[in-house]
Regions:
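Left-handed beta-helix
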Residues: 3-4, 9-10, 15-16, 21-22, ...
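Conserved catalytic-core motifs of eukaryotic protein kinase domains, centered on the activation segment
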Residues: 48-49, 146-148, 174, 208-209
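Intrinsic low-complexity, glycine/proline- and repeat-rich
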Residues: 219-250
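Short glycine/proline- and charge-enriched loop/turn segments
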Residues: 138-145, 213-220
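Short, low-complexity, polar/charged sequence segments that are solvent-exposed and flexible
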Residues: 60-61, 160-163, 215-219, 224-227
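Conserved beta-strand-loop-alpha-helix hinge in the C-terminal portion
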Residues: 194-219
Length: 250
């Protein structure tokens, strides 16, 4: 259902069973997949020359909450979910089931994998590369300018299964390798090795992630986290984790 106050361009391609809320604007160069909901006061496909005439593509079964703005020129696969007042700039390419929390900002020219979870108030700078099954907690900032202000852009890379805890800042060009954990309030200026915990300002290696124990089961390692946490993930993913990481420990 399209609310009577919504403005939907006749050039936009709207799938089946799509709900568009009050006072939302859908611009020309937009493709919206089936069974998608866009709440009120959103602006979808905001025009910009930086999009190079490419459309905004929103996959099937997505849910965009109110007051969010998506620029033209980005592509999101199925089951995109946002909080309120999210801004996503052009040339952002994301896989399945990206979740972007309230008041988060994706600055564009980004590549984001499958099942990425970005909580509220996350800033993802231009040229960021984010892998699969990443968790980014509130107030994290991914930077890109090594000597601001300048024309140099060095995006941050976060590889599969890594976690960036709340209020951390990743400096330009940093790579966080697979299965790693960045502790809360960290300032990361150097690459993070695979399967390690770093924390502090500047961040230093603390230990291997396997040394971190579950609070309620101190005899068990908390990492890799798919061995004990799978809430919200589909069976096909969980079954693959069982093959990769072994049976669930709790």
């Amino acid at each position: 259902m399209i609310h009577g106050s919504a403005i939907v361009s006749p050039k936009a391609k709207i799938g089946e069973n799509v709900n568009i809320g009050h006072f939302t604007v859908i611009h020309d160069n937009v493709i919206i997949g089936n069974n998608t909901t866009i709440e009120g006061y959103c602006e979808i496909g905001y025009p910009t020359p930086l999009a190079l005439n490419q459309p905004l593509v929103i996959g099937n079964d997505s849910y965009i909450r109110s007051h969010s703005i998506f620029y033209a020129g980005s592509t999101f696969k199925d089951k995109l979910i946002t909080g309120h007042r999210v801004t996503v700039r052009e040339k952002t390419y994301a896989g399945n089931n990206l979740q972007i929390g309230t008041l988060s900002d994706v600055q564009g020219d980004c590549n984001i994998g499958d099942y990425v979870r970005a909580h509220s108030n996350v800033h993802i700078g231009k040229h960021s590369k984010i892998g699969n099954y990443i968790w980014i907690f509130p107030f994290v900032v991914l930077t890109n300018d090594p000597h601001p202000p300048s024309e140099t852009m060095l995006g941050v890379t976060i590889k599969d299964y890594s976690i960036i805890a709340t209020m951390s800042v990743l400096l330009p060009g940093v790579t966080v390798n697979e299965l790693s954990l960045v502790g809360a309030h960290s300032l990361v200026k150097d690459d993070v090795e695979t399967g390690t915990v770093v924390a502090g300002s500047p961040a230093k290696m603390i230990c291997e992630t396997s040394s971190v124990k579950l609070r309620e089961h101190p005899e068990l390692s908390a990492y890799p986290w798919p061995k004990h946490f799978d809430r919200g993930y589909p069976d096909v993913v969980i079954n693959q984790w069982r093959k990769t990481f072994g049976e669930k420990i709790i």
